[in-house]
């Protein structure tokens, strides 16, 4: 069946998953639904002990079984040790047919590949995957299905009961003996625990895993004692230098600096740039450089950011500290400065992933964004974006909040160099659609800026300002093809190994097993 972005979704997938095809961004707007009800094991005795000696005991007490769904957050990023620690014990205990539900998976989890191959893990639900897991899925080693969801889409799936989490393991930088968890106060601080809120709320059992047990009560707690069944102390939950790698530095790449300048000019010359505007940006070099250059214009024009949303880095936190931003709401911290700013600035507020981006609540923060600056592996002439599948057909990225913020913001700006190595980033059709073109307003490249024809108001504003070289998206594609030629299409097999969910739970696209790799890599 053809969906709203022109992708053919096989009936077998719709029957297998019970899903509908994507029918546009606002298909489910205003349609009431019934939230799932969590199972709660009450604690009434005042002598109840939540402490367990190890992960093995936690699994036994949580009634671990074949076919269960276990969940994790990814706030420790490439420094995460919790996922592999727990899955190794599950493997050792002989459990099979596990569904692994994580807010994201990366190279830190490469050790899970043998568990995929032997049937310990049969389904994966994640924002996306990087590293060897993505390669394994793309080559058909996962026996079930990989379901890629946005951050908001994951919250929706768990709250509606589509994903039922049997045991949630929440890595906590600090925790007390009764389960009050914080992203701060330990030796592996990650700032916030936003992605784990929904797991703590909805899972049958919740296990806090910490390497820093502190005195009761560990307050303020992001995840409190009323949600946690057991507490397990281990030697190490993360590698600090891989959790937050220090201050993000502005890029010295001249191509990225040029795109950053174009992006800054686009923001500064469109109607939403006025005192009190709201803004979110990514963590790439061009995005960071754009935030820094935008701050200079804000100072010159005495314009203050009313709200910054993130995924946060040092430059955004500096805007807050300098008084150029009034408030930051935080779902993830990407460097040490952002981590520390959580507690050092009283106007820096942790929020849940649901508050941030869920499409199925009564209004998420993404809906109040004026601007969002995003990156993309590919953008096509319909303004569709691909952030998950590489040009070689291998799953190599994650949706993250890309579809959520792109739909929510009044002005969605996507930055992409015209060429990624020898591969055109602007093309006729993306390999896989993750964010629909109806969500994307402006594409910024090093060869010019294209405005979606859906937004004549933005095009007129930029024409009037004469601040950036304007091109059509087709012109940008043609320039790319004239330099490196039109790329060959990846040869996929028939088997579907994954689905790309739209944030409302409908099917945006499918990912097929790679038949022939072109050995073209995104640089």
Language-model segments: which ranges?
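Conserved alpha/beta enzyme-core scaffold
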Residues: 1-523
